[in-house]
Amino acid sequence: MNIRDLEYLVALAEHRHFRRAADSCHVSQPTLSGQIRKLEDELGVMLLERTSRKVLFTQAGLLLVEQARTVLREVKVLKEMASQQGETMSGPLHIGLIPTVGPYLLPQIIPMLHRTFPKLEMYLHEAQTHQLLAQLDSGKLDCAILAMVKESEAFIEVPLFDEPMKLAIYQDHPWANRERVAMSDLAGEKLLMLEDGHCLRDQAMGFCFQAGADEDTHFRATSLETLRNMVAAGSGITLLPALSVPRERERDGVCYLPCYKPEPKRTIALVYRPGSPLRGRYEQLADTIREHMQGYMETLSK
């Protein structure tokens, strides 16, 4: 038994499909299947039920998967401890980002991070919050940049900046001549929202419910750009995070208005596993991003 065998087993448990598990491990399906059988022979127990077309784990298999996850997390810690003995800001770093942050934040920080930490090899992974937290917990990610939610409280959260949300309306909307909109004015309105799984959806819905607004259930978007295009087409209004909003008050048929009483906003944070030996690396990374974004966010509020 070796570490690679445990990685195969955990991948199979996550994907419940031999080919997809093999692809995620960058090996052929016969290689992964063969190693799982060898693991069963070595342990003397059946880990999988092979009477079904589905991948079903036996009770012994499920127990071994959980223990394998623990072992792999500890191996990750050992590697981090070894890395800590060298230069803190060098070597590989796997960073996760949510889709409503990544496309808009990365152009602002990546060139700066490359200049500041030239020896840092950054690998960027985009996924929804629940997926990022699972990958962070399993050790696949070193840290993640996301909007703080209840589920992220199990990790160390380092706030980076607060990001306001702006109301996006079509250019012929009755409110298009306003300078800003009170949240109470949204009472009775129906807003376009992202589909389930996006934390921004839950946050925006919360602000809308407080204001007496509701969701337009005729359509749910997969991305902010789809929401923007639906607004431009006159199909509704929505809340968009400030980083995704252009500096112009109006562009491409969409008018962007600040909201107040209260100002809807979310906190963007860098999160990492508690007890990580590379805490100094993550804190330094967070400090650098926070300092850079502080000035940028101030320009957006003007």
Curated annotation (Swiss-Prot):
Kindly indicate whether the keyword Transcription regulation belongs to this entry: yes
Location of the HTH lysR-type domain: 1-58
Q: What does this protein do?
A: Required for the induction of a regulon of hydrogen peroxide inducible genes such as catalase and glutathione-reductase.
One Pfam family cited in the UniProt record for this chain: LysR_substrate
InterPro entries (UniProt xref): LysR_subst-bd, Tscrpt_reg_HTH_LysR, WH-like_DNA-bd_sf, WH_DNA-bd_sf
Superkingdom, according to UniProt? Answer: Bacteria
CDD domains membership: PBP2_OxyR
Q: In which organism is this protein found? A: Pectobacterium carotovorum subsp. carotovorum (Erwinia carotovora subsp. carotovora)
The UniProt GO MF terms for this protein read: DNA binding; DNA-binding transcription factor activity
| UniProt similarity note | Belongs to the LysR transcriptional regulatory family.
Q: Name one GO cellular component term.
A: protein-DNA complex
Which ranges does the entry annotate as DNA-binding region? 18-37
The transmembrane residues are: none
Protein known as = Hydrogen peroxide-inducible genes activator
Identify the SUPFAM superfamilies for this entry: Periplasmic binding protein-like II (SSF53850), Winged helix' DNA-binding domain (SSF46785)
Q: Which UniProt keywords apply?
A: Activator, DNA-binding, Transcription, Transcription regulation
